[in-house]
Amino acid sequence: MSVLWPCKNSASFSWTAPADRSHWTGPKAGRADVTGGGVACQTAAMEDAAARALGRVAANGIELAYETFGEAGGPPVVLVMGLATQMIAWPDELCEGLARCGLFVVRFDNRDAGESTHLRDLPAPRLADIVVRRRPPPYSISDMAGDVAGLIDGLGLGQVHLVGASMGGFIAQVVALEHPGRVRTLTLIMTSTGSRRVGQPKPRVYARLLRPPVAADRSAAMAAAVETFRLIGSPGFAFDEAYVRDLAGRSWDRGYDPAGRRRQLAASAGQPDRTAELRHLAVPALVIHGLHDPLVAPSGGLAVARAIPGSRFVGFSGMGHDLPRALWPEFVDEIAALTAAGGQRRRRDRPAG
């Protein structure tokens, strides 16, 4: 689809996919109301910090480290991060903003990342094997989706509002497909369907993805992160080098694992095309994508939105493959609006009595 429908915010574009996916319609006028469905969004009230707690939970045969924001009685939101990226890459301010909307926010480290279980007994695939898919990966995106389902069950969350970024978006899609009873709404950020015909990276970025520098120490890890995010980040927004350095340093302290990264990369490279399955997904869905993403081209997000019936696509001009600070309030508003709408839909669909 080549037609762009401008939102009220001139920096973004929005499409809504009807249930039959036969055509696209323009966005509703104005900003979505984020006060409905029992979710009272108070992103302007920044005085009181959201309650936070750290923990570990057994899930799918491993242990996952997690952190929560907000009160446990609120609608649960689970945030799934991407390749070789730890839960702290979900900015504290974004998590706290969602919590101030009355949501109970859970971020966690995937397997082979941060403080969760590192599967060092499994082989770390060679680059050549990953590229040509010569051998099955040590584990799959489906296995990682099973981790998320185990986290949801282990924390007693029931149905959650699931948010996935990059590879986390792959994982979130598979959770919704393979564990549908655990997902109330689905938000997918800078991700794709698994098809090799859409969402492909630029050659220079692909080379960096396959051969990232192996850091010898904390300082080198920070420098490498700056180099990477200058390559894949958002050209339309100021580059926050101090933030990137701080995040990379804290990630080094929590657990740097190049072999784990290769195992995750193999899982990502080995995933199938989910387009046909996504066409049968019956869950309120939002797809957010940077219109200048050099790692997962916008065609990937558009393909996801076109496949999921009734989904909404929001594309931000100037956004690359990161979460620019200037857009954090936009992300909070969009996610909170979807959770409110999803909660209302769930109450309407619930049988009487």
Predicted regions and their residues:
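Low-acidity, Ser/Thr- and Arg-rich intrinsically disordered low-complexity segments
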Residues: M1-T25, R31
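Flexible "cap/lid" loop of the alpha/beta hydrolase fold
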Residues: L177, T185-A216
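Acidic catalytic loop of the alpha/beta-hydrolase fold
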Residues: H292-V296
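Conserved acidic catalytic loop of the alpha/beta-hydrolase fold
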Residues: S142-V160
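Short beta-strand/loop motif that positions the catalytic acidic residue
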Residues: L281, V287-H289
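Catalytic active-site module of serine/aspartate enzymes centered on a nucleophile-bearing elbow/loop
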Residues: S311-G353
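Conserved HGGG/HGGXW glycine-rich cap/lid loop of the alpha/beta-hydrolase fold
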Residues: I62-V131
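Alpha/beta-hydrolase
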Residues: P201-A276, V283, A303
